[in-house]
Regions:
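Short hydrophobic alpha-helical segments enriched in small aliphatic residues
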Residues: 3, 9-12
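Intrinsically disordered, low-complexity regions enriched in Ser/Pro/Gly/Gln/His and often acidic
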Residues: 5-6, 112
């Protein structure tokens, strides 16, 4: 997390405030950590929740570098068609599939049913 300095002039006095500025990756990790057990989200959905629907690729890049897969369940993120990630960074497609199945999510031909399992957060 980065910090910034904000100066406010009030009644002729300068008041300095230190503010925390969250990086895009930190926003992504925070949102992904909220996806509940037994649910999935799409890259575009996470991007939109970060403030820009065009950040879907950035979401993928951030999750590929996930610093804490136990707390940030990147395996719960799929593409806009519900398809699993071919290049899942933490063991490949089979591991992602197994993790989702262990949460009760049906995976058929490498896809999940978004109507049934998509998080509406």
């Amino acid at each position: 997390m980065n910090v910034g300095l904000v100066a406010i002039v009030e009644n002729g006095q300068v008041i300095l405030n230190i503010i925390k500025i969250m990086t895009l990756n930190e926003k992504i990790y925070k949102i992904v950590s909220k996806i509940p057990y037994g649910k999935v989200a799409t890259y575009g959905q996470i991007a939109t929740l970060c403030g820009n629907p065009y950040y879907a690729r950035a979401v993928g890049n951030a999750l590929h570098k996930n610093p804490n897969p136990q707390k940030i369940p990147c395996y719960r993120v799929v593409n806009s068609n519900g398809k699993l990630t071919e290049n899942f960074a933490f063991g490949g497609l089979r591991v992602q599939s197994d993790l989702l199945i262990s949460e009760g999510i049906e995976v058929i031909d490498g896809k999940v049913d978004l109507e049934k399992y998509q998080w509406r957060g």
